[in-house]
Amino acid sequence: CWRRLPAAGVRLHCPAKVETLAQDASGVRVGLDDGLVLEARLAIAADGGHSALRRLARIEAPVHDYHQRGLVAFVATEAPHRDACWQRFLPTGPVALLPFNDDGDAQLHGHLGSIVWTLPETEAQRLLDAPQAQFERELSAAFGGELGGFTLQSQRAAFPLRRQLAQRQVEGRVLLVGDAAHVMHPLAGQGVNHGLPDVSALRA
């Protein structure tokens, strides 16, 4: 949790946005929107697919659009998910359930988890607009009924699915990690699986 960072000697500056970047042989200077200028030996860009540091470092990152959207929501299942990830591969794309701790108290709130449902853009919009009961029925059917009924616990949202690879991960004293370096399809959580080696390389 980010709240533990100060105890590890990490200084937090938030909320803040990066506005300027300058670097030379001795170090890098990052200017924030509140006027503060941070100086360091390296700037690690871990600021996501729309990385401001990547843009300021003039590193190109071409985008390939899958013309799909990832529909996400917080849900409760009627049947226990047994603290296991569930995934089904459908003609329209995979649907996955990522479990939260299953304490078995289904009478209180059901068995909680979050879904990521990969869909063509028009189908995703249809399900975003569908009445809640209809969406829940279609979601249950997408999982083959194995988890029983589904009950929405949040609003539905969707994000575009794209592949984006930075042309290089290092520019002088700026290093890209995680989604700032590579954005990929959420299938099987490969985004985080590729981000962790970036962090390991920093420690080497």
Task: Please report, for each region that a protein language model flagged, where it lies by residue.
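FAD/FMN-dependent oxidoreductases across multiple families
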Residues: 125-204
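A secondary-structure boundary/capping signal
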Residues: 14, 118-119, 180
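Conserved FAD-binding catalytic core of PHBH/FMO-like flavoproteins
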Residues: 29, 43-157
